[in-house]
């Protein structure tokens, strides 16, 4: 199913139309060949966007299938940096795909909802059959209004699953996938009782809801969940309650990043909880040097994509553009590789719901992924262990999906 970057012809069919689709696209998308956190989604590059105005008015390629690409090219700060890096990644994907029969209509949405709606409308008026982007949740909602009115699907990059829906698919790293993977792994290792210490934030609300659902679905039980102020204040009382409940649990869930996870661990320690007695787990936000340096979190498990694909992509990006890509750049690369593969192999059904929600999924830079009918996605993630020297692999990312994608 997976081939080297040079192998770009469809693989041997594995049975049925969807089997052929899965096999062929896995090879096509492997032409490139980890987890985004809310705190680092735009990376740390200090290089300003180059030629944003010119890029906003340009097209990439001259193929028959037109594809809208909406990015915050002229947005201030890190958003603009991300937009330019994602445009570069889209260009790189096009260049590396063998005879891509697509034309990318690059539109600058300015990082605003109004800009996104206008950009989507313009791309559709110019013949776009599918929209890639935007990046921000409010922009996705606005672009979706224009796209739905014309029956044009959207593959967006927001991490807010609330904006997904009929015809609006999210390619981003969603916290729900993180929770599903890490809880599932813990239960597979014989853990059954969970206690959660969760930041009181929109992100915390999402992961808490998913945490409770996944634990119940997989046959475990949640002993208690306590919330703490996202700014790290007033942790004493909720930490005390978690420490008491932890006596009846064998897993401690701390879904926070960097300083937040460290502060939570210290507060629990001050409340008398011995984290070494439990298996501590987190989300992809743990992929952070501050987490690795915290003794109370050492040995904790967290999910992340296999880093090999991103390292290889970064090297090629650096060679072409002279700087490191932001982490979101892989989303644009995979989106372009996906639509190029679909345009090449799927004829008139290239962007149909059936094609996009193929349960066998697709292979990209960061591993396998598939879209669900509700517009969210599932990703094949590895499980890593936090150590002072960084994340250490304890379970590899799956290379294929089993079961339906619903």
Describe each PLM feature range.
Residues 123-135, 154-157, 193-198, 246-261, ...:
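Periplasmic-binding protein-like
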Residues 321-395, 404-406:
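Segments of small-molecule ligand-sensing domains
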Residues 28-31:
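C-terminal motif of bacterial Sec signal peptides marking the signal peptidase cleavage site
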Residues 170-227:
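An alpha-beta-alpha
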Residues 33-36:
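Bacterial signal peptide processing site
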Residues 261-333, 346-347, 397, 401-404:
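Extracellular/periplasmic periplasmic-binding protein-like sensory domains
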Residues 48-88, 107, 113, 328:
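Extracytoplasmic "Venus flytrap"
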Residues 84-85, 96-162, 172:
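Beta-alpha junction/loop-to-helix N-cap segments that form part of ligand/metal-binding clefts
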């Amino acid at each position: 199913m997976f081939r080297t970057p040079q192998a770009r012809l469809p693989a041997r069919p594995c049975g049925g139309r969807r089997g052929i689709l899965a096999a062929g696209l896995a090879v096509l998308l492997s032409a490139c060949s980890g987890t985004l956190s809310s705190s680092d989604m735009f990376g740390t590059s200090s290089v300003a966007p180059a030629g944003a105005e010119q890029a906003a008015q340009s097209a990439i390629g001259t193929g028959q299938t037109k594809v809208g690409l909406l990015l915050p090219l002229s947005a201030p700060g890190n958003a603009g940096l991300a937009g330019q890096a994602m445009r570069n990644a889209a260009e790189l994907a096009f260049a590396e795909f063998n005879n891509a029969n697509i034309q990318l209509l690059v539109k600058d949405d300015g990082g605003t909802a109004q800009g996104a709606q206008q950009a989507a409308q313009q791309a559709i008026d110019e013949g776009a059959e599918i929209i890639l982007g935007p990046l921000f949740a409010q922009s996705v909602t606005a672009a979706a209004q224009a796209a739905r009115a014309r029956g044009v699907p959207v593959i967006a990059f927001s991490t807010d699953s609330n904006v997904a829906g009929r015809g609006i698919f999210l390619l981003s790293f969603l916290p729900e996938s993180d929770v599903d993977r890490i809880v599932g792994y813990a239960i597979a290792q014989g853990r059954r009782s969970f206690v959660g210490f969760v930041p009181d934030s929109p992100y915390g609300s999402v992961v808490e809801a998913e945490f409770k659902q996944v634990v119940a679905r997989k046959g475990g039980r949640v002993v208690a969940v306590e919330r703490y102020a996202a700014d790290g204040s007033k942790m004493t009382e909720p930490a005390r309650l978690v420490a008491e409940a932890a006596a009846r649990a064998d897993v401690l869930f701390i879904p926070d990043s960097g300083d937040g996870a460290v502060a939570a661990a210290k507060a629990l320690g001050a409340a008398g909880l011995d984290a070494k007695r439990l298996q501590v787990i987190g989300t992809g936000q743990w992929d952070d040097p501050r987490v690795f340096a915290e003794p109370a979190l050492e040995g904790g498990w967290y999910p992340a994509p296999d880093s090999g694909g991103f390292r290889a992509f970064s090297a090629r990006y650096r060679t072409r553009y002279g700087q490191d890509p932001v982490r979101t750049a892989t989303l644009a690369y995979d989106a372009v590789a996906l639509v190029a593969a679909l345009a090449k192999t799927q004829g008139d059904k290239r962007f149909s719901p059936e094609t996009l929600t193929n349960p066998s999924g697709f292979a990209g830079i960061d591993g396998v992924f598939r879209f669900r009918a509700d517009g969210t996605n599932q990703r094949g993630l590895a499980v890593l262990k936090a150590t002072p020297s960084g994340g250490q692999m304890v379970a590899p990312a799956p290379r294929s999906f089993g079961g339906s994608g619903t």
